[in-house]
Amino acid sequence: MNDPIQEITAGDGTTIPLYWYPATGTGTVLLLLPALGIQAKLYRRLAEQLCDRGHSVAVMEQRGHGNSALRPSYSCQFSLDDLLEFDIPAALDWLELQSPGCKIVLGGHSLGGHLSTIYAGRAPSRLAGVLHLACAFPHYLDYPGKERLLLRFLCTVMPLFKLAPGYYPGGLMGFGSRESIGMMMQWRQWCLSGSFDYDGHTNIAVAGAFTGSVLAIAFEQDNFATQAAIERALSPLSGANVSRVSLGAEEQGEYLGHVNWARSPEGTSACIAQWLAGLSTGSH
């Protein structure tokens, strides 16, 4: 299947690429948000497999990556607020036009899961469900050993990148990719505080507001997903019906860990498809 890239216009005029995989029928539709530093094309196989099982999938390219025309620099800055206020609503608007009457799930991998959680609290009536994939909050105290040290180190040096080179050099740091320093300074606040709030926002992830279904999939061999961090990521969804699943070699073979699962996601797609089918029929 060729990559069917659609371009939509966000509320601030930015062009947002969507990888669109339309299925036949009226199955639940998924809008998937990538992890930090990950291009949307990584999730092509997952989207194709879900499409083959009757569920339309759109994967939203994150600003600054892949087919996005933006590249972070001194003159090109964006933040989590841009994704939440402009990009996600525009993508959902587009999906509602493409799939009228279908239930829509918002989900994401790692950072994409956090954004899904926040948006679900803001607009719970728009969504039938929320999906977390390898989604664990980055609060440094929820991690042991070298992962804790890495997070603390990144928090220490992050402000320096505002001075030079004007963006976060993830390739150099071995974590993430080239990212907007504005967004990463917000991520830094998450790391230090353990709260979803940032930049003066309070109760940004409205606790208990979303009361629908949540599927949280964790993967064995994921060093960036301790149980404490997973539960912190789910904490705003206290009013929801949360299903927790951990996939290992039996479901995923050798494709495990924080990112590698997406390269051959057969077990993951089967798990998600079963859950989406339940949403379509109202069984959960």
Model-inferred region functions:
Residues T226-P236:
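Short alpha-helix in the alpha/beta-hydrolase fold that links the catalytic acid
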Residues F210, A216-A218:
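Short beta-strand/loop motif that positions the catalytic acidic residue
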